[in-house]
Amino acid sequence: MRLLGKLRASAASSAPLEPAFSNVLTPNRIPEFFIPPRLPTPYAPESSPPAAALPRRCAAEPDLWLRGADDGAGRTDWDPRSQAALSLPHLPRALTAYGFCALLESPHTRRKESLFLGSPSSAALPPAPRPRAHTYGGGGGDAPLAPGARSPIATPAARGGPSPSLDTLAPPPRCRRLLRAPEGLLRRALRAGRSRGLARARSVSSGDGEDDDEDESRASPGSPTQAPVTSLSPHRDPRPERLEAEGTVTLGRAGGALRLAAEYNRASGRLRVRLLRAEGPAGGAAEPRAPVGCRISFVLKPRGAVVRRSRRAVLEQDLCLDGLSEDEVRRLAVRVKAENRGRGLERGRLLGQGELLLGPLLLL
């Protein structure tokens, strides 16, 4: 028994000892930290099956796919995102029981971690030509590959020899258009957004510009309808820089009206409102000797936020505001209050009041 114990101890000392608790962290055994974490694969790769039973993509790259011990029947890659990921060369794949290539699944979340499970060795491989490149983007993969360019890659794997070298797997320059497909999609989306913004700017332009376009189209009946659109520069702003309009404020109690003129400059943000004349009883027609005073105030909604107020009794006066954006002018309103400044009991009598929105007036 003593001899058997010595033999057993010598055999155990000659074999490499494995730690009893491999999942316990000690100062001498701390794994390298990565984001996202690189977890070990719970199964080891088996020997590669014959190339005749493999699809063309897996046979061309035998080192990029791993066959798991459990090929779940519920695994599916029919969604568009998985189909697009299958066309990328650096993602690991697994062979299903039916002979198809599928993406590997994460062992701890049971999700397709197509970007996190790739090993550094497989990620360093250059992209190889594959016929399903058109599933990821619109460019690339339209022209079929020549059989001569595909034979040197598939021949070593079919004969059971060593895996092809990196120089052999290097694709021709025309097959690298797959990596530039997202840039084309982004460029197309930006161009579509720019065209929508230009169409919106044309829709909110003033009516004077639309009348000018109609006059130009009527002046040249022989010219095609697309000629005015193509003659405009794409960088030119179709909206006018200065907007001018006139409006009438009706005084409800007195039955009269006040005529206002508004002018807005887009470049400087300057708004100018001028009270032109008073019509009806507010203009002094009923009582010629009684002076009329108009109190004008700019009101920003919500009501009560008074920006500027004028108490002068002069009708033709200019009220200016600087540094206003289009959104502020769109919400701005002119509130006019007319009162009689006569003598005795008639003094301070309210003749009427009204309000005029500047946004619809200036077509903003």
From Swiss-Prot:
<keyword id="KW-0539">Nucleus</keyword>
<feature type="compositionally biased region" description="Polar residues">
    <location>
        <begin position="220"/>
        <end position="233"/>
    </location>
</feature>
<protein>
    <recommendedName>
        <fullName>C2 calcium-dependent domain-containing protein 4A</fullName>
    </recommendedName>
</protein>
<dbReference type="InterPro" id="IPR039208">
    <property type="entry name" value="C2_Ca-dependent_4"/>
</dbReference>
<feature type="region of interest" description="Disordered">
    <location>
        <begin position="192"/>
        <end position="242"/>
    </location>
</feature>
<feature type="region of interest" description="Disordered">
    <location>
        <begin position="118"/>
        <end position="175"/>
    </location>
</feature>
<comment type="similarity">
    <text>Belongs to the C2CD4 family.</text>
</comment>
<dbReference type="GO" id="GO:0005634">
    <property type="term" value="C:nucleus"/>
</dbReference>
<comment type="function">
    <text>May be involved in inflammatory process. May regulate cell architecture and adhesion.</text>
</comment>
<dbReference type="InterPro" id="IPR000008">
    <property type="entry name" value="C2_dom"/>
</dbReference>
<feature type="domain" description="C2">
    <location>
        <begin position="254"/>
        <end position="364"/>
    </location>
</feature>
